[in-house]
Amino acid sequence: MSEMTPREIVHELDRHIIGQKNAKRAVSVALRNRWRRMQLSGDLRQEVTPKNILMIGPTGVGKTEIARRLAKLANAPFIKVEATKFTEVGYVGKEVETIIRDLADIAVKMAKEQETKKVKYRAEEAAEERILDVLLPPAENQWGEKEQNEDKGTRQTFRKKLREGQLDDKEIEIDVALPQVGVEIMAPPGMEEMTNQLQGMFQNLSGSQKKKKKLKIKEAFKLLIEEEAARLVNQEDLKANAIESLEQNGIVFIDEIDKICKREGSNSGGDVSREGVQRDLLPLVEGSTVSTKHGMVKTDHILFIASGAFQMAKPSDLIPELQGRLPIRVELEALTAGDFIRILTEPNASLTEQYIALLKTEGVDVDFTQDGIERIAQAAWQVNERTENIGARRLHTVMERLMEEISFDASEKSGEQLTVDAKYVNDHLEMLVENEDLSRFIL
């Protein structure tokens, strides 16, 4: 779990996302409150529930990007889902409980990686001994029994060569565990739990079989480390720790929640199904127990962050019960031409940096001047204003169109230099930007 302060979280988000100060502050406080809650005594800790967040803002302003970056910072089980992927119980499609089941899989994977790191040194030692046993097999006595090889000097010599990588390309034959047979079972919606149980049963029937395999020592060492680490990790404890981490620190990000709103004045059957998805989400957000293949998961203390553009619907179109479960509202602002200039230059691995690096691989040096960047930003903003406003995503379209010619010819122009200034941008984009019909179809 992340121990970063809200200021540190905002600073980290600032490296990748321009503007949206309020949204960054809200998610940073929510993330820090997870840590604060864990410092409380047992009884009080159970009473402190997370304050779920609803992010409202037009498309392309950074809602999803905040979620992506938050996932890396959280160091906790995190899942991002699209609300439109789910259907009401009884309809064909995924049920909302699969969110928690998928999150449980993520939590177990994270716990496995953490536990494997703890035993990595012991696993490496055990794998090393197994390889040395293959390289220096113990001699057999007259009764066919294996005797311990007492020549420690030879073993140490081989150990030194092994650690220095001198034996990496030597082939050896080792016993490796066969991967468990994966059985794909197609089941109707709502039967995911039964499917998981059947798959587990078939995997157990296959057992842990081994077979001899000829591999280079470098590859064999990796396989043996994985085998030894799996043997050293207690699987039951691992699952228990994963579920504990999920229940106390889990975060669910639900994108496009506005698409499951019942629009005002609409009485279509599709809207009924959408409202059903909201009602199915309620128990999860409110706190319920979900059955997963790793065990029962309580959702009482999982943090839910929902986001939507709310262009066709309003937050008040959500069912009242769900509105009440999303107490913190954050509005993200539409991006201006000035924001576009910052997006092109300030973030880590900005768009201009990416194009410079990509064309550098062909030997072409690209230089973006300040007036060139300003003209690109202005062009993207103009197209957004005249057609559909898709936010910062418009920059990708404009940049791809602008760099199309040099990207195509780059392999034949190795050693050349290209300066992208205002004149270059005007020559390549002006007609498209000024002509609204062309903008609609090309940009």
Swiss-Prot record:
Q: Which GO terms describe its molecular function?
A: ATP binding; ATP hydrolysis activity; peptidase activity; proteasome-activating activity
Under InterPro entries, the record lists: AAA+_ATPase (IPR003593), ATP-dep_Clp_protease_ClpX (IPR050052), ATPase_AAA_core (IPR003959), Clp_ATPase_C (IPR019489), HslU (IPR004491), P-loop_NTPase (IPR027417)
Q: Which Pfam families match?
A: AAA (PF00004), AAA_2 (PF07724)
Instruction: Give GO cellular component annotations, separated by semicolons.
Output: HslUV protease complex
Which residues does the annotated region (Disordered) include? Answer: 138-158
Task: State the Gene3D superfamilies in the record.
Answer: 1.10.8.60, P-loop containing nucleotide triphosphate hydrolases
Q: What residues does ATP bind to? A: 18, 60-65, 255, 321, 393
GO aspect biological process, one term: protein unfolding
Q: Does the keyword tRNA processing apply?
A: no
Task: Provide ranges: composition bias, Basic and acidic residues.
Answer: 143-154
Localization (cell): Cytoplasm
Sorted UniProt keywords:
ATP-binding, Chaperone, Cytoplasm, Nucleotide-binding, Stress response
Quaternary context: A double ring-shaped homohexamer of HslV is capped on each side by a ring-shaped HslU homohexamer. The assembly of the HslU/HslV complex is dependent on binding of ATP.
Mind telling me which NCBIfam families this protein's record contains?
Answer: hslU (TIGR00390), PRK05201.1 (NF003544)
The family line of this record is:
Belongs to the ClpX chaperone family. HslU subfamily.
Its biological purpose is as follows:
ATPase subunit of a proteasome-like degradation complex; this subunit has chaperone activity. The binding of ATP and its subsequent hydrolysis by HslU are essential for unfolding of protein substrates subsequently hydrolyzed by HslV. HslU recognizes the N-terminal part of its protein substrates and unfolds these before they are guided to HslV for hydrolysis.
What this protein is called in its record is ATP-dependent protease ATPase subunit HslU
Q: Which organism is it from?
A: Pseudoalteromonas atlantica (strain T6c / ATCC BAA-1087)
Query: What lineage is on file?
Result: Bacteria, Pseudomonadati, Pseudomonadota, Gammaproteobacteria, Alteromonadales
